[in-house]
C-alpha cells in the first residue's frame, strides 16, 4: 500500500470500530478520527445529550457534516457511528473517498460488549437491548454490505489481530 488511502470502518455498535481504528492508525502511522467523538468535541456535549435535545435526525445531520469534512482529508482512519450508513449521502461519501471496511459482529457479542455502556442512546429505551440490536441489524446490515469493500468478522479476534488482518488485505490491493 504505497499511497495512504483513507480507511473507513463501518459496522454496528460494539463491533470494535473505535478500538480497531486506533490500532490500525498506529500500525499504519495514519491519523485517527472517530465521527462520534468529533461530534461530541464540536458540540461540547455527549452523544446521548445530542440525541435527547435534537433527536436522531438532528444527530444524523451533524454526522453527515462531520463525515463530509473528515473524509476530505488524506491518509486517515475513520471509525463511523453505527447508524452513519442510514443516510445515502454518507454511503456515497464513504464509498467515493476511501476503502470501506465492514466490521461484522453477532448480536451476542454486541450485547456483551455494550452491556455496561451508558453512552449508547439507542440502547437506553424500555425495549430489550436484544430486540433493539436485532431491529438495527435488520435495517443496517444490508447498507453495510452495500458499500463495503471488505468485511471482517470481529467476534473471536483481538483488536490488534483484526488490525493486522486489515493491513494484510490492504497490502494485496
Curated annotation (Swiss-Prot):
Its cofactor is Mg(2+). Keywords: Amino-acid biosynthesis, Aromatic amino acid biosynthesis, ATP-binding, Cytoplasm, Kinase, Magnesium, Metal-binding, Nucleotide-binding, Transferase. InterPro entries: P-loop_NTPase, Shikimate/glucono_kinase, Shikimate_kinase/TSH1, Shikimate_kinase_CS. Pfam families: SKI. The keyword Kinase applies. Its main location: cytoplasm. Pathway: Metabolic intermediate biosynthesis; chorismate biosynthesis; chorismate from D-erythrose 4-phosphate and phosphoenolpyruvate: step 5/7. ATP binds at residues 14-19, 120, 157. SUPFAM superfamilies: P-loop containing nucleoside triphosphate hydrolases (SSF52540). It is found in: Cytoplasm. GO terms for molecular function: ATP binding; magnesium ion binding; shikimate kinase activity. Binds 1 Mg(2+) ion per subunit. It is an enzyme of class 2 (transferase). It catalyses: shikimate + ATP = 3-phosphoshikimate + ADP + H(+). NCBIfam families: PRK05057.1. Catalyzes the specific phosphorylation of the 3-hydroxyl group of shikimic acid using ATP as a cosubstrate. HAMAP family: Shikimate_kinase. This is Shikimate kinase. The gene is aroK.
Amino acid at each position: 500500500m504505497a499511497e495512504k488511502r483513507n480507511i473507513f470502518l463501518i459496522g454496528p455498535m460494539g463491533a470494535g470500530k473505535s478500538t480497531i481504528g486506533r490500532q490500525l492508525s498506529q500500525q499504519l502511522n495514519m491519523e485517527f478520527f472517530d465521527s462520534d467523538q468529533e461530534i461530541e468535541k464540536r458540540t461540547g456535549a455527549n452523544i446521548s445529550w445530542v440525541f435527547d435535545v435534537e433527536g436522531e435526525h438532528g444527530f444524523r445531520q451533524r454526522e453527515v457534516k462531520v463525515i463530509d469534512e473528515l473524509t476530505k482529508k488524506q491518509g486517515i482512519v475513520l471509525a463511523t457511528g453505527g447508524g452513519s450508513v442510514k443516510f445515502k449521502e454518507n454511503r456515497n461519501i464513504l464509498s467515493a473517498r476511501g476503502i470501506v471496511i465492514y466490521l461484522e459482529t453477532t448480536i451476542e457479542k454486541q450485547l456483551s460488549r455494550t452491556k455496561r455502556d451508558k453512552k449508547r442512546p439507542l440502547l437506553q429505551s424500555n425495549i430489550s437491548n436484544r430486540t433493539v440490536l436485532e431491529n438495527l441489524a435488520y435495517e443496517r446490515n444490508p447498507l453495510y454490505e452495500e458499500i463495503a469493500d471488505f468485511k471482517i468478522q470481529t467476534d473471536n479476534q483481538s483488536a490488534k489481530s483484526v488490525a493486522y488482518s486489515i493491513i494484510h488485505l490492504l497490502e494485496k490491493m
